[in-house]
């Protein structure tokens, strides 16, 4: 493994350009990837999205700051691709581009896409709903499949459990409004979608299987999950259908909040991060093992400059290409405070009304010091970033992990102070002894 002084390494190798990935422009396609310690990188082009029919493999040229580059003088819209990274002139890893914005079925191969061809009719005319104050947001949490999978949803059978179900109008069950017609009745301002970024554990090629996952097993952070598409083999299909979802909600003055899971990857050594540049994008303990602050086997290293850049670039892409209105960060406390504040600043440049909130806790112990992490008790260091309050939750019902830890409704009157503070929005109340909360 590589033992790096990450701060010095970042100073020497940080890349600040906004052109990593596959970029189409003026009849040519440019590919750039970052891997400073690679001794060779190759671009592999495929005819299909499963990586079975290779067209050609091209060596990439090394530029400054660890960037590898190749330019192809033709429009590759619809062509699939991967990279092969070579280390020490012998170890070779083929993988999807971590910056891929579209992919084939099951997310093993990236796709070059002209996003202008994915816009549904009327996409440019629909305006984002206004939310002038985040405190006014009324958020409805929703899983794409759960929203319409049952026949009682009233959605067309081919749309059940899919992105496009949100665009089906006039749906009812026994005279009662369902799906988007029901959402319109609720008075909500936003729908928070459980993860729609491409995740690992549902086989998109077998839609007839009864498969299900919440989506907290991230695989490709910039690609959409294909199991919610009516045809996952076509990269443009899931993009167009998700835009139809966003458009349908926006037409009814409902914003879209994405649940983002940048804190870990489902795979560790086999992840695209590790295959692109081993031991950089994840946090590593002093003994060389992967730290596990997520409780899922690893945690990403937002304090490393190029992981931070990846998160910022990814969020900027979702906010601009898909007109997303908010981001909910899973296990946000695994990200360092500096990164969280930079993200807020970058989102403000796009739209100050974009919501940003997350979980102010971790799923395990992180090697990064607690005073640098975005824990809820460090919230005074954030600007316009909300946090979930598990204190009020536990004060009402009791502890989450200990069945004998009672809450107020179970007779624990000692929880009253915490409950009162939560009802008041956790605003500091100086007569309260916070050391006992």
Ranges and model annotations:
Residues 1-26, 54, 62-168:
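The feature marks proteins involved in alpha-glucan
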Residues 27-31:
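Structural beta-strand segments of beta-rich domains
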Residues 33, 142, 193, 318, ...:
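Conserved, mostly hydrophobic/aromatic
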Residues 35-40:
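Short proline/glycine-enriched turn/loop motifs at strand-loop junctions of beta-rich domains
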Residues 42-44:
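Beta-strand signatures of extracellular beta-sandwich domains
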Residues 145-322, 339-351, 355:
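Substrate-binding/active-site clefts of carbohydrate-active enzymes
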Residues 344-437:
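Conserved alpha/beta catalytic core and glycan-binding cleft of carbohydrate-active enzymes
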């Amino acid at each position: 493994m590589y033992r790096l002084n990450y701060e010095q390494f970042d100073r020497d190798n940080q890349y600040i350009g906004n052109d990593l990935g596959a970029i189409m422009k003026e009849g040519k396609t440019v590919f750039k990837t970052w891997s400073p310690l690679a001794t060779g990188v190759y671009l592999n082009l495929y005819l299909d999205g499963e990586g079975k029919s290779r067209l050609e493999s091209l060596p990439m040229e090394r530029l400054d700051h660890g960037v590898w580059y190749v330019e192809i003088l033709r429009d590759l819209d619809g062509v699939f691709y991967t990279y092969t990274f070579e280390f020490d002139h012998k170890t070779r890893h083929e993988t999807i581009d971590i910056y891929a914005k579209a992919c084939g079925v099951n997310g093993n191969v990236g796709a070059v896409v002209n996003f202008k061809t994915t816009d549904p009719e009327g996409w440019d005319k629909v305006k984002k709903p206004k939310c002038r104050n985040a405190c006014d947001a009324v958020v409805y949490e929703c899983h794409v499949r759960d929203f319409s999978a049952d026949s009682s949803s009233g959605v067309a059978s081919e749309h059940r459990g899919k992105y496009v179900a949100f665009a089906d109008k006039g749906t009812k069950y026994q005279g009662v409004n369902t799906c988007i017609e029901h959402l319109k009745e609720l008075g909500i301002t936003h729908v928070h979608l459980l993860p729609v970024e491409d995740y690992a554990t549902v086989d998109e090629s077998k839609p007839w299987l009864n498969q299900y996952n919440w989506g907290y097993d991230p695989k490709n952070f910039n690609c959409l999950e294909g199991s919610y598409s009516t045809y996952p083999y076509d990269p443009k299909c899931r993009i167009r259908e998700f835009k139809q979802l966003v458009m349908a909600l926006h037409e009814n003055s409902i914003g879209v909040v994405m649940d983002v899971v940048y804190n870990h990857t489902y795979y560790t050594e086999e992840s695209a991060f590790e295959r692109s540049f081993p031991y950089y994008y994840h946090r590593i303990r002093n003994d060389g093992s992967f730290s596990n602050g997520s409780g899922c086997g690893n945690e990403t290293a937002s304090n490393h400059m190029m992981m931070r850049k990846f998160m910022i670039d990814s969020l900027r892409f979702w906010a601009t290409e898909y007109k997303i209105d908010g981001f909910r960060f899973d296990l946000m406390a695994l990200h360092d405070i500096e990164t969280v504040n930079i993200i807020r600043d970058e989102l403000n440049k796009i739209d100050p009304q974009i919501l940003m909130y997350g979980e102010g806790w971790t799923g395990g112990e992180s090697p990064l010091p607690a005073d640098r992490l975005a824990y809820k008790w460090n919230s005074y260091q954030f600007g316009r970033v909300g946090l979930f309050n598990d204190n009020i939750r536990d004060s009402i019902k009791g502890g989450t992990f200990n069945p004998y830890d009672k809450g107020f409704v179970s007779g624990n009157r000692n929880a009253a102070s915490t409950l009162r503070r939560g009802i008041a929005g956790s605003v500091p109340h100086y007569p309260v002894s916070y050391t006992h909360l």
